[in-house]
Amino acid sequence: TTITALRYKDGVILAADSRTTMGAYIANRVTDKLTQLTDNIWCCRSGSAADTQTVADLLKYYLSMYRIQFGHDPSVHTAATLASEMCYQNKNMLSAGLIVAGYDEKTGGDVYSIPLGGSLHKQPLAIGGSGSAFIYGFCDANFRENMTQEEAVEFLKNAVALAMERDGSSGGTIRMVILNKDGMERKFFAIDTANPIPVFTH
Amino acid sequence: MSSIGTGYDLGLFFSPDGRLFQAEYAYKAVENASTCIGIKCEDGVILALEKVVTSKLLKPRVNNRIGSVDRHIGIATTGFIPDGQHIVKRARDEATSWRDNYGSPIPGTVIADRLGNYVQLFTCYSSVRPFGVMSFVATYDSEGPHLYMVEPNGVYWGYNGAAAGKGRQVARNELEKLNFSSLKMKDAVKEAARILYATHDEENNKEHEIEMTWVGVETNGIHTPVPDELLQEAEAYARRIADGEEEDIAMQE
């Protein structure tokens, strides 16, 4: 898996590859690893599919209960804290690496990384999954804060594409979600389409 | 109270005319307790209560009945002191649990709701008795100032001005005269002192001490005791008013 999220000028963008494996077998080549938690908060999932789907479902439920009980939308920080608490308290049973990102009018866009142990890190750019190991250098060299939407989409597309080329557990297509004051927009990149995946190897 | 003496007040169950006597007795316990008031003003909340000094051996200003529950929450209780301490402890547990789960301060409306629900439980079981306290919850959060009063049966309402205890009637009359939407914290401290002095029992000249805390803009959103200097100034003001009123009454005679 390769998952990424970043803060850009107007909000946040999440991106992920689409490969799910069972050992060497590709169980799904068009997986959606970007999961909606609330209207304006999404997460990227990496690790065990069963574990992360369950954690995401529970998060979704708790956050909707929060809205019902307390009469306002939970902040991105609240969603991320809740996610990290669940991952931390159950660390012995879980294999889940999450990135929680969202946009709200009060704080703007925020990205939180929740790696394996359940710790919580607020970051301008977060990368995760097995594929991320191959793109730390690329991200260090090319990431800038306050990018335009076009720059940010291009950066994430290249980052995920590079990881997909080198990581055997990443591949398939690239999915993105853009969150800003105008709401949500999805992007999809695949070979032999109008929105192709960039190729770097020769 | 026709059902008294028929056994319906010996447990937490309804009498034939639909009353919970144990819950009603809890109110009686608070009615004779020391006066406690809360004022919600434009930029914060004031909690104030009056303590009868029962012994000269007691150290002044240390036996507090208003507790801090979180950075932005204060709770004053009047009635059974141990019950009040238990309520404050419970509120602290709720506040820390919220912080653990959501990584943010617990909203005022939520802490009041949680306490109300907790207190209500003690009107449901035969193995426990209801709390003999009124709890004043003062908070200041992103939504602004809040003041709630939780009653012994679990009911809680939001208030601009609230009073409980022996002098509640006098205090409520005085509170009704305040203009809460324009009142500032520093002025509210003076008003709180004045109101507590106005509730003083004339014949009963026991030693009294005023405990006062506040939370709001003036304190950067942190619940803390009103500084000694300001409290003394407010008490001096209250004493002057109290003396002045006495003169007015004398002149009318």
UniProtKB/Swiss-Prot annotation, chain B:
Keyword Oxidoreductase: no
Domain of life: Eukaryota
GO biological process: proteasome-mediated ubiquitin-dependent protein catabolic process
Keyword annotations from UniProtKB, A to Z: Cytoplasm, Nucleus, Phosphoprotein, Proteasome
Subunit and partners: The 26S proteasome consists of a 20S proteasome core and two 19S regulatory subunits. The 20S proteasome core is composed of 28 subunits that are arranged in four stacked rings, resulting in a barrel-shaped structure. The two end rings are each formed by seven alpha subunits, and the two central rings are each formed by seven beta subunits. The catalytic chamber with the active sites is on the inside of the barrel.
Function according to Swiss-Prot or TrEMBL: The proteasome is a multicatalytic proteinase complex which is characterized by its ability to cleave peptides with Arg, Phe, Tyr, Leu, and Glu adjacent to the leaving group at neutral or slightly basic pH. The proteasome has an ATP-dependent proteolytic activity.
Protein name: Probable proteasome subunit alpha type-7
Gene: pre10
